């Protein structure tokens, strides 16, 4: 079986594949203070809960945007799953034309998402990954990764408001029924969610124009489903986009993986 791991700024998401079937997934917080044993035992507990032997894992592929946790994660995988993990973009060819001015600057997760989305949804395409940061990625009609935009995540923006404005409270992120808030909390929620939807709409519209026409818009990330309820330009929501991209990269590089 294949274990695909998406290491994000807030969470690590683990997906266990049996062939092309996602057998199960789980997430834990991204914490650079954990030891490799702590991390390894969390992974082993998940396997035990689902009555899966750690020895059944034959390959591990990782996409990460958090370098400080990689040493610990790699050691945990080696010790508890007995596998040498492969890092997407470093050890395995991601398999998409990258038109960034400096291709090394692009986060591996963004390219992995592109591989997955093009396979599933076609092209041209805009991928909106809504998490700690929100990224917009443009795939042209030839399937090439053209670049995109990076925007602060909604939770990050709300936390900054709480920290910098002494009289404003920390609030849950939800959209009140009315644009005109009748309390401070409602006003903050209205401004945050409606303002964020406005930003999504504006950036997607501008990217559509630069791509030269209508491109399908796919949302993913921790807040992708919530924002899709409010943003009419989002066509699809795919929470497993990155995991599925990692699986595809494994399949495309299977021979190299098996010869490691």
Model-derived features: where do they sit?
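Glycine-rich phosphate-binding loop of actin/hexokinase-like ATP-binding domains
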Residues: 27, 31, 123-159, 235-242, ...
């Amino acid at each position: 079986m294949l274990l695909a791991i998406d290491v994000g700024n807030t969470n690590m998401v683990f997906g266990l594949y049996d062939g092309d079937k996602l057998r199960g997934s789980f997430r834990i917080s991204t914490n650079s203070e954990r030891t490799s044993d702590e991390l390894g035992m969390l992974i082993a507990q998940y396997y035990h809960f689902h009555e899966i032997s750690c020895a059944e894992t034959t390959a591990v592929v990782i996409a990460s945007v958090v370098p400080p946790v990689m040493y610990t994660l790699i050691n945990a995988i080696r010790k508890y799953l007995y596998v040498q993990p492969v890092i997407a973009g470093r050890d395995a060819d991601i398999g998409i034309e990258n038109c960034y001015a400096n291709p090394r600057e692009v986060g591996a997760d963004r390219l992995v998402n592109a591989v997955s989305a093009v396979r599933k949804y076609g092209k041209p395409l805009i991928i909106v990954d809504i998490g700690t940061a929100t990224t917009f990625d443009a795939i042209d009609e030839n399937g090439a990764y053209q670049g995109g935009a990076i925007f602060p995540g909604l939770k990050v923006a709300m936390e900054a408001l709480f920290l910098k404005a002494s009289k404003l409270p920390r609030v849950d992120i939800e959209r009140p029924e009315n644009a005109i808030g009748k309390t401070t909390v409602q006003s903050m929620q209205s401004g945050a969610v409606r303002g964020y939807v406005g930003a999504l709409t504006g950036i997607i519209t501008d990217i559509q124009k630069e791509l030269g026409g209508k491109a399908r818009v796919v949302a993913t990330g921790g807040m992708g489903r919530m924002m899709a309820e409010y943003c009419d330009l989002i066509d699809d929501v795919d929470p497993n986009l990155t995991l599925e991209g990692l699986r595809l990269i494994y399949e495309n590089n299977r021979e190299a993986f098996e010869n490691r």
